[in-house]
Regions:
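Radical SAM enzyme [4Fe-4S]-AdoMet core and its adjacent flexible, acidic
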Residues: 1-66, 70, 79-80, 84, ...
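Flexible mid-to-C-terminal extensions adjoining Fe-S/redox cofactors in radical SAM and related proteins
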Residues: 88-170
């Protein structure tokens, strides 16, 4: 697949791993810690062997696990314009339709700021998978709205089983 992308002229590619979220999550499809390590090694090896930029969304330049949303590196805009911390955190306080410029929203949103601090202080991985309880508390504290069309994200978060993410301190 990497070679095919190079043949097609792609200059870079992103690796994302499945996050079992939503009303019909399939946790059996999520990678085990061993499988995640195997993918991570593959990405690192391909970076030095292939003439294409390879971005692993869940690791920093030093190879340490991270949550891109906890760094402020990424946000997600829902189809309705809601500004979410990441694609699987489907809660928001702000919208692209708010009066202030986007840069102000990204930099001054108390919800986004508190999300970053919460995620960074509890894991280098995915807070949704590792600590959905804390994420639920944060959404309640801020009165963040469910940005899904099904309006079940809060219940889904509360019923989640803890799962490993990309952070593996062992």
């Amino acid at each position: 697949w990497v070679d095919r992308l190079i043949e097609l002229g792609a200059l870079y590619m992103w690796y994302h791993t499945y996050r079992p979220m939503g009303p019909e999550a399939s946790p059996e499809l999520a990678l085990s810690p061993e499988e995640q390590l195997r993918i991570r090694k593959f990405v690192v090896e391909m970076r030095v062997k292939k003439p294409i930029g390879i971005i692993d969304a869940y690791y920093d330049a030093d190879g340490k696990a991270l949550c891109p949303a906890a760094t402020g590196f990424t946000h997600h805009i829902s189809p309705w314009g809601d500004i979410e911390p990441c694609p699987i955190v489907q809660f928001a306080r702000e919208s692209i339709y708010d009066e202030r410029p986007l840069a102000d929203t990204f930099n001054n949103s108390q919800f986004l700021t508190d999300f970053r601090q919460l995620a960074a202080s509890h894991t280098r991985g995915c807070i949704v998978l590792e600590r959905p309880d804390l994420l639920h508390e944060l959404t309640v504290l801020h009165g963040a709205k469910d940005t899904t069309a099904r309006n079940t994200a809060s219940a889904e978060l509360q019923s989640m089983t803890l799962r490993p993410s990309q952070y593996n301190p062992a």
